[in-house]
Amino acid sequence: MNILITNDDGYRAKGIRVLSEIMKQFGNVTVIAPKHHQSGMSMAVSLGLKQLAWRELDEEEVDRAAIFRTRADIPAYEGSARWSYLDATPASCVKFGLNTCFLDNFPDVVVSGINHGSNAASASCYSGTLGAALEGALNGIPSIGVSLDTLDPEADFSPVVKYFPAIFRKLMSSLPERKGIIYNVNFPDIPADEIKGVRTGYQGRGRWVREFKMWDPAIYAKLGITPEMLGQSSVPKCEEGEILYTMVGDFLDDPQNTPQADHLLMKSGYISVAAHNIDTTDYQEVSRLQGNVEMDF
């Protein structure tokens, strides 16, 4: 099996290092990840004549560049992974891979992650992790996004190491004939022995409130985020008259959600699996509109 891996936290993040090791047991691993942090990019791509820097890396270089220290939860499987970074969005990384490394034969699967932070509920609309998976699905490739519900750069990924291989096997052994589907897998941030199981659910609904706050270095320090992780050498300086803001916010749950909403399944101690599709048509609404807006001229 040929596997293409990417993420939106950048090649230096712990999550993608863990994922690359997990996937070695399933076949040949190629990693093409963003050079810098690209969260919230959804399916954005780098258009036009913008120059995109690409560089091959060996695994020792990846380890030296890592922005994490704890490694006890990183498995070690036989085999190696081909690593490189692209100074572009996650979806562009997949595009680049399909047009270079896999030009003659597409990979058997695209796996994006492991994301530092939940991509359940409305977060999936913004997710660069899922945007990369959607790019794979757009090309007819089975694609999976994997996330752990914590922003901690030193996160303990042992629950993903323990349970994702079985989830992956089940998903790959029961693929539908229809193309264009991605699987959004979200792990709760609890010890592996406290996880109750795996449940399928739907994309929960909600929105963020109080999203913008004036810049305070303590916000990023609390999350363990440095300017370098965001592709910056320092905090941007203000021009005259400017005020720096950062986007954080609090998630407000939609009261119409049922317990089968993916983010609520996680809250209940389950790994949630939701199926998304590149076709965003609301067919029920299309049927309703047929009798309301269709006209002949």
Regions found by a protein language model. Name each.
Residues 3, 14-99, 106:
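A cross-family phosphate/adenosyl-ligand binding-site feature
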Residues 6, 32-34, 112-115, 146-147, ...:
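Short beta-strand segments
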Residues 9, 37, 89-90, 115-118, ...:
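Short glycine-rich anion-binding loops that position phosphate/pyrophosphate groups of nucleotides
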Residues 97-104, 131-142:
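Alpha-helix C-terminal capping segments
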Residues 118-127:
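Glycine/threonine-rich flexible loop motifs
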Residues 123, 137-159:
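Glycine-rich phosphate/pyrophosphate-binding loops
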Residues 126-133, 146, 159-172:
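Active-site glycine-rich loop that binds ribose-phosphate moieties when present
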Residues 172-178, 184-297:
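C-terminal accessory domains and tails appended to enzymatic cores
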